[in-house]
């Protein structure tokens, strides 16, 4: 059901993530499993509640991305969907490069 509300589809993408819960300052390490220009899905056994404001950092071996976001849905003991907001132009380029690479991998069958 969430996918129907997305502006653009998410693609499979694996990377490390660090989330900072804005209100409490609590940090959590997790793994991203899907990515789009507007958000991502984060695998974690302890997802944050819907509506929680976060600051998310996503890391690959070569690049990183960071932006504020909000939890738009959560699946108990599985993970949560994040929507990005106020993404800086430099980081839009990072997202676009990651998405192009992930789409190319998917097309080539890797």
PLM region descriptions:
Residues 22-24, 37, 74-79:
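Short, conserved beta-turn/loop elements at beta-strand boundaries and strand-helix junctions
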Residues 1-35, 96-110:
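N-terminal helix initiation/capping motif
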Residues 41-44, 77-86:
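Short, solvent-exposed secondary-structure boundary/capping segments
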Residues 15-21, 51-64:
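Short conserved beta-strand and strand-loop elements enriched in small hydrophobics
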Residues 81, 89-99:
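A short macromolecule-binding patch
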Residues 8, 43-47:
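Short, surface-exposed secondary-structure edge patches
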């Amino acid at each position: 059901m969430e996918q129907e509300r997305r502006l653009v589809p998410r693609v499979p993408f694996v990377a490390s993530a660090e989330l900072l819960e804005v209100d409490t300052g609590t940090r959590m390490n997790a793994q991203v499993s899907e990515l789009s220009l507007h958000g991502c899905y984060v695998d974690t056994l302890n997802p944050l509640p819907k509506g929680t404001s976060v600051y998310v950092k996503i890391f690959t071996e070569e690049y990183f991305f960071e932006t504020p976001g909000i939890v738009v849905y959560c699946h108990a003991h599985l993970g949560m969907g994040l929507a990005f907001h106020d993404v800086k132009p430099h980081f839009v380029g990072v997202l676009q490069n990651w998405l192009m690479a992930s789409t190319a991998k998917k097309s080539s069958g890797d």
